[in-house]
């Protein structure tokens, strides 16, 4: 929802899942991403359609720094779709446009920012764009004294390293899988689904601390080591 494991929740602009709409899209970039097992997601920066050229360039820089190939966006200049301004909107079908409009709750004046790649890359890209838009629009103005404490849980137990071609422990190799998921360690196709008994406490986008429940059984620890 926020593209970060230490989310800033004092403003909205949550990440929206759009992958299912673009499996057979006329926009090749999105279609290829879905075919390759990636995702297509977006955020709606409310009221930011009047963004300047300089600000667009800055958002593009942020996206590329996070691993994106570029910046795909739509400026919603008016109440009808013929007022949507974007280098990519001409490739979308009417059905795709209607789905985007509904899922993102698009209104006149909005700016839509897309991400398409692996899940991890898209989360990072849109998470950073979300924070950059907040800074550009002063979305936290008047909220400086708000204290949004929350727990972040259900972290993945394992993460796949594309460069090294192997699985690693996201937290550490002694972290316990969620109850009932221990047997999934025997099935490599399920490793990405396993959640960890780990948790962080976050305040206003800053991690204050965290921890985990450890593995105490020798056989379970051996299974974990065999994965790594």
Regions inferred by a protein language model and the residue ranges of each:
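Class II aminoacyl-tRNA synthetase catalytic cores and aaRS-like
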Residues: 1-228
């Amino acid at each position: 929802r926020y593209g970060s494991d230490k989310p800033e929740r004092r403003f909205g602009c949550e990440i929206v899942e759009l992958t299912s709409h673009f499996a057979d899209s006329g926009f090749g970039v999105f279609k290829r991403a879905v075919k390759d097992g990636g995702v297509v997601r977006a955020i709606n920066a409310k009221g930011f359609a009047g963004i300047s050229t300089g600000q667009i360039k800055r958002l593009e820089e942020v996206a590329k720094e996070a691993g994106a190939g570029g910046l795909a966006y739509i400026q919603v200049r008016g109440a009808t779709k013929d007022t949507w301004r974007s280098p990519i909107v001409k490739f979308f079908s009417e059905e795709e446009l209607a789905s985007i409009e509904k899922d993102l709750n698009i209104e006149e004046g909005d700016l839509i920012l897309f991400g398409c790649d692996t899940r991890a890359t898209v989360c990072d890209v849109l998470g950073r764009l979300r924070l950059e838009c907040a800074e550009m629009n002063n979305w936290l103005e008047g909220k400086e004294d708000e204290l949004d404490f929350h727990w972040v849980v259900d972290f993945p137990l394992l993460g796949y390293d594309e460069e090294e071609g192997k699985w690693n422990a996201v937290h550490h190799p002694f972290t316990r899988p969620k109850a009932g998921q221990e047997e999934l360690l025997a099935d490599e196709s399920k490793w990405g689904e396993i959640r960890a008994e780990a948790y962080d406490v976050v305040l206003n986008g800053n991690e204050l601390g965290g921890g985990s429940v450890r593995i105490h059984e020798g056989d379970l620890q051996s299974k974990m080591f065999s994965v790594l």
